[in-house]
């Protein structure tokens, strides 16, 4: 699991100051690029798509900085929300071009996981990623944010705009489906 780098109140304050915004945004980008890239990548799978969505995320974040009024925790949640929307927008565009549902796109992406993993990849990890891509979209989002990004339910609730209890139920169902799916591959 990865941990999300700390975003300090001093960094948030620097982002609000027009004279220091560019330098502060560079620091924010350096701190959050990797976790946001991997959050997006787990949703869209393809490296180039993840790069595009990540770039879009940071452009939208920079453009929206003047309107942002929260603190450090809210900034992290806001960035994840922008990243999630960028990934979902990309998946919807792909869906329109394929005339498929998001779940069908997920199944298509599961096939790509093995292709992109390469010959040296840990087979158990590849199977886990394939199984995660077969989850319904909401469960996939919650599982990725909780398991891979190691975010607390309170942060996930801010990112997805859902109640914590709802997220816990979605995570539980996701884990149960993954256990069943992975056990059938043994």
Stretches with model-predicted labels:
Residues 1-35:
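N-terminal module of bacterial RNA polymerase sigma factors
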Residues 2-10, 97-121:
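Internal acidic/polar
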Residues 67, 81-102, 121:
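Arg/Lys-rich amphipathic alpha helix in sigma70-family domain 2
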Residues 142-146:
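A short pre-motif secondary-structure segment
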């Amino acid at each position: 699991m990865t941990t999300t780098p700390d975003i300090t109140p001093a960094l948030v304050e620097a982002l609000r100051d027009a004279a220091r915004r560019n330098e502060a945004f560079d620091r924010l980008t350096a701190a959050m690029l990797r976790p946001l890239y991997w959050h997006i990548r787990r949703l869209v799978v393809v490296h180039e798509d993840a790069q595009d969505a990540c770039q879009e995320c940071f452009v939208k974040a920079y453009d929206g900085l003047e309107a942002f009024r929260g603190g450090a925790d809210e900034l992290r949640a806001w960035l994840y929300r922008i990243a999630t929307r960028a990934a979902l927008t990309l998946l919807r565009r792909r869906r329109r071009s394929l005339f498929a549902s998001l779940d069908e796109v997920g199944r298509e992406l599961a096939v790509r996981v093995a292709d992109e993993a390469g010959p040296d990849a840990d087979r158990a990890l590849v199977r886990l990623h394939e199984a995660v891509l077969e989850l319904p979209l909401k469960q996939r989002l919650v599982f990725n944010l909780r398991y891979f990004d190691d975010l607390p339910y309170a942060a996930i609730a801010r990112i997805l705009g859902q109640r914590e209890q709802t997220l816990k139920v979605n995570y539980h169902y996701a884990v149960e489906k993954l256990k069943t799916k992975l056990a059938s591959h043994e």
